[in-house]
Amino acid sequence: MQQRDLRRQGFFDFHHQRTGIHCRRIRHDPGAEPFSTGSKARDKARVDALATEIDKLQDLFYADRRYKLLVVLQGTDTSGKDGTIRGVFGRTSALGVHTVAWKAPTSDERAHDFLWRIHERVPGDGEVVIFNRSHYEDVLVPVVNAWITPEQTRQRYQQIN
């Protein structure tokens, strides 16, 4: 079990070695109650309050330059990722908040390790970065479409697990 836990932290360990900054993963509890209360008016009020709080926190992040936040939204097409970004982060200052929508890798990105483009876009000090989709798709899509060899697949799994 301990060895598996260490492998799961591979990305964070790599980032720590590269930058000297310790990262920690915050996981959503799948057993938690959904955000929706069943009332559109109450849900809108909750999103408004959350957006206001995020805007204030982002201002502190930007001014303090000690902390950073990476938000990764993963879901199928039409699952609400763009709407979540607009609704929750749309009212924050453009200073220090960036959204990255991952598309097919460019030829320059393909010339590097598959996580290279991910590492290039993680937040800097004082920044909030939102990933619209995750690096897991750079494993899943090529495997499903047989674009990479079984050895490349194994290597990618090792890097993200």
Annotate each predicted stretch with a short phrase.
Residues 4-161:
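Glycine-rich phosphate-binding loop of ATP-dependent small-molecule kinases
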